[in-house]
Amino acid sequence: MSTNQIPLTDQGDNYVNVWSYVAQDLYNHYGETLYNSWFSKVNFIESSLNTVILCAPTNFIRDWIKSKYAMVILQLFQHYNNAIKSIEIITKEVPGTTQTVIELPTKTFSNISNSALNSENTISTLDLRFTFDNFVVGAPNELAYAAARAVAESSGAVFESNPLFLYGGVGLGKTHLMHAIGWYIKQNNPSRKVIYMSAEKFMYQFVKALRNKEVILFKEKFRSVDVLMIDDIQFICGKDSTQEEFFHTFNTLIDNNRQMVISCDRSPSDLDNIEDRIKSRLGWGLVADVHSTTYELRLGILESKIEQMNVKIPKDVINFLASKIVSNVRELEGALNKVIAHSNFTLKAITLENTQNILRDLLRSNERIITVEDIQKKVANRYNIKLSDMYSSRRLREVARPRQIAMYLSKILTPKSLADIGKKFGKKDHTTVMHAIKKVEELLENDIELREEINLLMKILQN
């Protein structure tokens, strides 16, 4: 048994001790606000056949923790004792057992030892939510994903293109990939020493080392690792002393065949106020661009998150989110979480109308208003039919199908009700609109060409 493992020879105090460590790790990792919201009222109940049973105060908190944090909690328990195979979260006390509430300090812990989130060979905290398994791959990020995976799977060797330089806008997945590399190495090659750190934190630690006359220790720390990952390297632009130290750290690691992974919001050639010699070295290896998300990728990300969270979301809501929240993945996931949380707290069903109301401020700030008239004009032009055909009752396929598509897009891209949309299409009733939307949704299941056509129309309308 590892020296970090806590022997669980009975089902009493030792299990309670493990829960206290896990609770502290959760507090330290997620912070006071999130801890108090979700974990502070969770109690240890008992253990049974290598299963730890915890009690949440409400069904909502139980379900939320199960969907978002269950794997994190299990991994933390297993760090302290790998005999624990599963956790169960209930909302009732088990008769004859004693609840154990872990009281935590109001300040963040500064020194928690033996944490699964901060092991001796992984410096700086890795976010357990970000793994390769839950990274959704699409055309905009497939090169970056493949390269990150190759780095992680190199098993002690150095990826042939060193450093790996990932760049792209905010919230597109660069940080996710860096955490995924760290977690993969930690799980499969635990003897390898990995540092993941933001460039800002790198600078602050360097300044602190200068102030405390501990520069030698700083150099030893960063130049003795197997993998160094620095996030948001653009932060050191214009900071000459930090650039000098980074330059020498970079050279030492590359010369010793150690892996480097760097992320940035722009390509190396576009960095300003940074030394040319650093700019040149950042481009030595593989430079992978993480592009803005496509509609298909956003759809995949939403479906993956919904599956992880084990919730049911109507198709029209998913399509609406994928078409409307286009800036970045972080905002997309935030919008989904907001919709789900609103439903859980208010006990209102998740519908397209409710979603549009919940996100109206976000949508207003994101893009211009699209009207039903805009959609009718663009679709008519795209399919080379008369605008008047949108209001007619003609059933010829070459007219009826574009009209159905326009109704579908009106439901997805505008806040109008079915009845209001029907009025815009020659005073048709809401059942006609509903039938059109359902027909298009059924076709989208298998018709790739139609899916691409609708994606193109969305881009035309949104731009």
Swiss-Prot record:
ATP binds at G171, G173, K174, T175. It comes from the Bacteria. Residues 344-463 are annotated as: Domain IV, binds dsDNA. One of its GO terms (molecular function) is lipid binding. Residues 1-84 are annotated as: Domain I, interacts with DnaA modulators. InterPro entries: AAA+_ATPase, Chromosome_initiator_DnaA, Chromosome_initiator_DnaA-like, Chromosome_initiator_DnaA_CS, DnaA_C, DnaA_dom, DnaA_N_dom, DnaA_N_sf. Keywords: ATP-binding, Cytoplasm, DNA replication, DNA-binding, Lipid-binding, Nucleotide-binding. The keyword Nucleotide-binding applies. GO terms for cellular component: cytoplasm; plasma membrane. Residues 125-343 are annotated as: Domain III, AAA+ region. Plays an essential role in the initiation and regulation of chromosomal replication. ATP-DnaA binds to the origin of replication (oriC) to initiate formation of the DNA replication initiation complex once per cell cycle. Binds the DnaA box (a 9 base pair repeat at the origin) and separates the double-stranded (ds)DNA. Forms a right-handed helical filament on oriC DNA; dsDNA binds to the exterior of the filament while single-stranded (ss)DNA is stabiized in the filament's interior. Belongs to the DnaA family. Domain I is involved in oligomerization and binding regulators, domain II is flexibile and of varying length in different bacteria, domain III forms the AAA+ region, while domain IV binds dsDNA. This is Chromosomal replication initiator protein DnaA. It comes from Rickettsia typhi (strain ATCC VR-144 / Wilmington). The gene is dnaA.
